[in-house]
Regions:
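Beta-propeller folds
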Residues: 20-256
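Bacterial Sec-dependent N-terminal signal peptides
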Residues: 1-26
Length: 256
């Protein structure tokens, strides 16, 4: 009996020594950003996760995959090569990744943007079912999934392209009056300038008159030679811009 007790004690001591030998003290290389081993110790995150109805989607660089919540198992829906082949067959451009892909319709389709088109792809049939021409310079894009109409701005004016590809210029304002963009320098939680109704048949937008505001001499340093690009900026105590809101009924240019 005594020998058995001694054997158990010996095993406990041996395991304690082994555990102590396995302990590792962290160094600055492990703990500091930029350290040789820092990024190896970070938890791995998944970026680009979206919900496709009740299905979790991982849209990364090369593939669009579904993820099973119970076990994390992934299933490839479509690849970048397959999508670009579909786009090339219809001369709709190409995409370089799926980071900007969206899934507006539950468990049905994927929306991707090329430089020249918005494209809906049926992921089950792996075919293009709809496309919409897009101006390469279109900014502040706001797409409605019900009407498939796209509101966007070119310079300071607002345009709408309907689902059948017809484009309507909503405003024709001179320089100094901005339509369809965020106002009040994005203060008060304002981050956009167009707002679709749920059915996509009405579009509300901001109109900002800043023609009375003095120019602030901003310089664009990204050009080969720095260029002057004045910005309307009301200094303290000086005249500020005026903002109003309008609503247009699609598809006719009817203001309300």
């Amino acid at each position: 009996m005594r020998k058995l007790i001694n054997l158990i004690a010996l095993l406990i001591m041996a395991s304690s020594v082994t555990w102590a030998q396995d302990k590792k003290s962290f160094t600055l290389e492990d703990l500091m950003p930029g350290g040789n081993n820092y990024y190896n110790l970070l938890p791995q995150n998944l970026y680009g996760l979206q919900w496709w109805g009740d299905v979790c989607i991982n849209a990364d660089i090369e593939e669009v995959k579904t993820i099973q919540p119970a076990n994390g198992k992934e299933n490839v829906l479509i690849t970048l090569q397959e999508v670009n082949e579909l786009l090339a067959n219809k001369e709709l451009g190409k995409i370089n990744h799926f980071r900007n892909a969206s899934f507006p319709y539950a468990e049905k389709m994927m929306l991707v943007n090329t430089t020249s088109n918005k494209v809906l792809i049926d992921l089950t049939k792996k075919e293009i079912i709809w496309s919409q021409p897009l101006s390469p310079k279109a900014a502040n894009q706001d797409w409605n999934k019900e009407s498939r109409s796209l509101a966007y701005t070119l310079d300071n004016n607002l345009f709408v392209t309907t689902a059948d590809g017809k484009t309507q210029q909503v405003t024709d304002e001179p320089k100094g009056i901005v339509c369809g963009q965020s106002v009040h320098r994005q203060e008060f939680g304002i981050s956009k300038g167009t707002f679709w109704s749920p059915k996509g048949n009405l579009l509300a937008f901001y109109r900002m008159d800043e023609s009375m505001v003095t120019d602030y001499p901003q310089v664009n340093t990204s050009t080969r030679i720095a260029t002057l690009e004045p910005d309307k900026y009301p200094m303290a105590g000086m005249t500020s811009h005026k903002v109003s809101a309008s609503t247009i009924r699609r598809p006719k240019k009817q203001f309300i």
